[in-house]
Design a protein with these regions (language model features):
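Sec-exported extracytoplasmic/periplasmic mature domains
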Residues: 42, 46, 131, 135-139, ...
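Short amphipathic
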Residues: 23-29, 98-102
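Surface-exposed short loop/turn segments
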Residues: 49-99, 103-121, 128, 132
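Bacterial signal peptide processing site
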Residues: 7-10
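Acidic/histidine-rich, surface-exposed loop or edge segments in extracytoplasmic proteins
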Residues: 18-27, 111-114
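C-terminal motif of bacterial Sec signal peptides marking the signal peptidase cleavage site
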Residues: 2-5
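Post-signal-peptide N-terminal segment of Sec-exported extracytoplasmic proteins
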Residues: 27-59
Length: 147
């Protein structure tokens, strides 16, 4: 309650989050990573909005991150980044353009099936976390700019 008195209002209050539902048209996915990203954003914002357009480009890479002296790899790091832009659908004005990055890692120990499962799970978690970061940034931008 004291935040309202000073002019601040929570980003995640009911009015701000419901304002975004069905207002953002999200770029259609073309890869498995993009589908996971897209699905997560649709869960947050709905789909087929008519006010804003959200475009994105996802990239991931893997790197050995824990090696012992004989060169055995014990952990694999997956780095991911997403460049995104939010535009006004009516006039094409760019409202937000930025990049989010993060990384996760998984153990390379165990059976082939276990390692492949760890890789898939970690990759999915990374893309979901990137989608959360983008959704938060978009929500904050819309509230800050009072759109």
């Amino acid at each position: 309650m004291f935040l309202t008195a000073c002019g601040f209002s929570p980003v995640y209050n009911e009015n701000n989050t419901t304002k975004l539902i069905q207002q953002i048209s999200i770029q259609e996915p073309s890869t498995q990573e993009e589908f996971i990203f897209y699905s997560h954003l649709v869960d947050r914002f709905g789909s087929m909005g008519d006010k804003y357009v959200l475009n994105y480009a996802i990239s991931t890479s893997t790197e050995d991150s824990a090696l012992d002296f004989d060169g055995t790899v014990h952990r694999i790091e997956i780095s991911g980044s997403v460049s995104f832009s939010l535009k006004d659908k009516e006039n094409g004005i760019n409202l937000l353009s930025d990049k989010e990055e993060m990384y996760l890692s998984y153990s390379n120990a165990g059976s082939t099936a276990a390692v492949l499962n760890a890789e898939r799970t970690t990759n999915k978690q990374l893309v979901v976390l990137l989608a959360d970061k983008v959704a938060d940034r978009v929500s904050i931008a819309i509230v800050e700019k009072d759109l």
